[in-house]
């Protein structure tokens, strides 16, 4: 069995956040779900996070700007989630510090496939 990942989920849509959290927890991961970028920026445990899974369309800041601000404080594997999947959107995610761009809606298996290749940062 693989080592559980510590995942910070940044998603303002409550139903989506709950669905993703339940799936990830069922897969054995530890999930902390927060609704906005300001809450993410205020966390003092970013160095202990293995994965940041963030929506791009947050209410207070777009996910690209958020990742630029978070990246100096964490080496976590970062996955952008967006309804936009054009080449320009994907390139913007990568340029902002994300390692992967997941297009919504997605099936849970697609997320687990990405996570399968992520190594825990500090176990």
Mark where each language-model region is.
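C-terminal output helix
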Residues: 106-115
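The feature encodes the CheY-like receiver
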Residues: 59, 86
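Acidic catalytic/metal-coordinating carboxylates
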Residues: 36, 62-65
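Short amphipathic alpha-helix used as the core "switch/output" element in two-component signaling
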Residues: 64-75
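Charged docking surfaces used in two-component/phosphorelay signaling
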Residues: 18-26
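Conserved acidic carboxylate
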Residues: 11, 35
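Active-site beta3 strand of CheY-like receiver
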Residues: 47-53, 58
């Amino acid at each position: 069995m693989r080592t559980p990942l510590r995942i910070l989920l940044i998603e303002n849509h409550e139903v989506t956040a709950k669905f993703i959290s339940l799936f990830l927890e069922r897969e054995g991961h530890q999930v902390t779900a927060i609704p906005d970028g300001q809450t993410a920026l205020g966390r003092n445990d970013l160095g202990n996070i293995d994965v940041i899974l963030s929506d791009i369309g947050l209410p207070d800041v777009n996910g690209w700007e958020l990742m630029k601000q978070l990246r100096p404080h964490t080496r976590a594997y970062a996955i952008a989630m967006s309804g936009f999947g054009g080449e320009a959107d994907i390139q913007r995610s990568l340029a902002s510090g994300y390692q992967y761009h997941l297009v919504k809606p997605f099936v849970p298996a697609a997320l687990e496939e990405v996570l399968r290749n992520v190594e825990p940062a500090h176990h």
